[in-house]
Amino acid sequence: MKKSIILYSLFFIFFSSNTAAIANEDYVKYVNPLIGTDTSFELSNGNTYPAIARPWGMNFWTPQTGKMGDGWVYTYKANHLVGFKQTHQPSPWINDYAAFSLMPSVGKLSVLENERKLKFSHDNEIVEPHFYSVILDEINTKVEFTVTDRSSFFKFNFPKSENSNIIIDAFFKDSEIKVIPDENKIIGIAKNNSGGVPENFANYFLIEFNRPFKKSGVW
């Protein structure tokens, strides 16, 4: 009887210790959101984009190398970024729904994609399921963002400059932007879609800044 009790006790202790070790394991570190992004229209190697999001989150965020309306939002071989995009895209073939993007700028303001795009290197990029960071060397600016179930937090680390800007691109198809400078807020509606939506389909968003605007405008 004593031997049975001792063996049972040892097994129980071993099992309990092993369970605690598993519970404390950080499985997020094993996830690489870049898997499947080395792809193109001509050759599919996954057709994915690095989705920074909570599980079942309302919105996904992703760095953007493709042009507005291009289903290949982020391709690993690209060396320029045109924005950081809130996306609801299920696949490149279906394209996106109710999307808009943010993009920092320093110096002369250019809002068009081909003019505002900036070089980046994967060596200066951190991509995790819950966090993204990249250094844009051309303007000496670091961009970081993380997400919640329904919102996101961005941090733009600009150099000392009298002309640092954040461009908000609400895409097309009757989308709207309104600047509220007295409250450091911008509100907007993104309606872009690829069909199959109700007549009142829209994504209503609010962006709040921690610093006042020196100037603002829409185009």
Report each predicted region and the residues it spans.
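Positively charged n-region of N-terminal signal peptides that target proteins for export
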Residues: 1-4
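General helical structural elements
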Residues: 6-7, 58
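Bacterial N-terminal signal peptides
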Residues: 8-16
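Sec/Tat signal peptide C-region and signal peptidase I cleavage site
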Residues: 18-22
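Accessory carbohydrate-recognition regions in carbohydrate-active enzymes
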Residues: 23-219
